[in-house]
Regions:
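Cap/lid segment of the alpha/beta-hydrolase catalytic domain
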Residues: 115-148
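Bacterial N-terminal signal peptides
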Residues: 9-18
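Conserved acidic catalytic loop of the alpha/beta-hydrolase fold
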Residues: 152-170
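Conserved alpha/beta-hydrolase
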Residues: 104-119
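A domain-start/cap signature at the N-terminus of enzymes
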Residues: 21-76, 84-100, 104-108, 135-142, ...
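Bacterial N-terminal signal peptides that target proteins for export
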Residues: 1-10
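Serine-hydrolase catalytic core
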Residues: 238-280
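Structural cue for short, hydrophobic secondary-structure segments
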Residues: 77-82, 111, 267-268
């Protein structure tokens, strides 16, 4: 299992935000100035776990700040785990990156945990199979006959972060992932209209993705652009927009293509990331 290299993580975090040195007081829901802040959770991930209720189900996540409380954080990094579904490791690695930069009081770290049946502990837990979560596919049906796209989980996180009563100083959110998590982030970037959240700049960082989504049927090689022949299903989701999932169908394929091309997405490829047997 590989994690995001520390140097890459530092770079990803450092381009997120340039902070002002001025202390800006938080204004709570009652309108009163409040300069107090909750101390960030910086210990091991097990101590920084919370539950996000979405529709009539829930998903666990790790966070350095409580999403249901008011904070004066300026930025958020949402880090998505790889195939090993080890959100705790990714949370701890990104926390170490933020601490390395001395920004633990200014940047919150959030790491969702997309689980399978094997990790399911509660009847309300949303869960997927080992690959469907990273494609934005629907979870398995709950006992109530409902399901949710894994993309919908990040939607809920962004919706909460866009609440200016709770996060009055928050201006930027970076969504990043490594390997399978990078594949998730790259495909998810096609679902968000630029400036969809008026008070938030949402950016994406894709590090060592397993594969890449293309906006059309063209592909690239050392010889240039070409359209593959005798290669069935090469343009199917998540490699292309053919036979996409219900989330994309509701959004609209043409909208997704437009969003894909308009969003701010940074790509990172590790020179030494050449192992082909490790699918994390």
């Amino acid at each position: 299992m590989k994690l995001l290299p520390l140097k890459v993580g530092v770079y990803i975090a450092s381009f997120l935000i340039v902070f002002s040195c001025e202390e800006i007081p938080v204004t709570d829901v009652s309108g009163k100035a409040n300069t107090e802040r909750e101390s960030p959770c910086l210990s091991e991930a097990a101590n920084c776990t919370d539950t996000l209720k979405i529709d009539r189900g829930s998903i666990n996540y790790y966070s350095s700040f409580d999403l249901d409380s008011s904070h004066d954080i300026r930025g958020v990094i949402v880090t998505v785990h790889g195939a090993a579904r080890n959100g705790d490791d990714y949370f701890e690695r990104m926390i170490s990156v933020v601490q390395e930069l001395g920004l633990q009081e200014e940047i919150a770290v959030i790491a969702p945990s997309f689980i399978t049946l094997y990790e399911k502990q509660n009847e309300l837990d949303w869960y997927w199979n080992t690959t469907s979560w990273k494609w934005g596919n629907q979870s398995y049906m709950s006992d109530l006959g409902e399901s949710i796209s894994s993309f919908g989980v990040i939607d809920e996180v962004l919706l909460r972060l866009s609440n200016q009563n709770q996060f009055p100083n928050l201006s930027q959110v970076l969504i990043t992932g490594h390997s399978s998590g990078a594949a998730f982030v790259q495909t998810y970037s096609s679902t968000k209209e630029n400036n969809q959240y008026k008070n938030l700049m949402v950016r994406f960082a894709v590090a060592n993705s397993q594969y890449f989504l293309y906006p059309d049927s063209s592909r690239y090689s050392n010889q240039g652009v070409y359209v593959p022949t005798n290669c069935n299903n090469y343009n199917n989701w998540p490699l292309g927009f053919t036979d996409s999932n219900p989330y994309i169908d509701v959004l609209g394929v043409e909208n997704a293509k437009m969003f894909f091309l308009s969003n701010k997405v940074e790509y990172f490829v590790g020179q030494n990331d050449t192992e082909t047997s490790d699918m994390s």
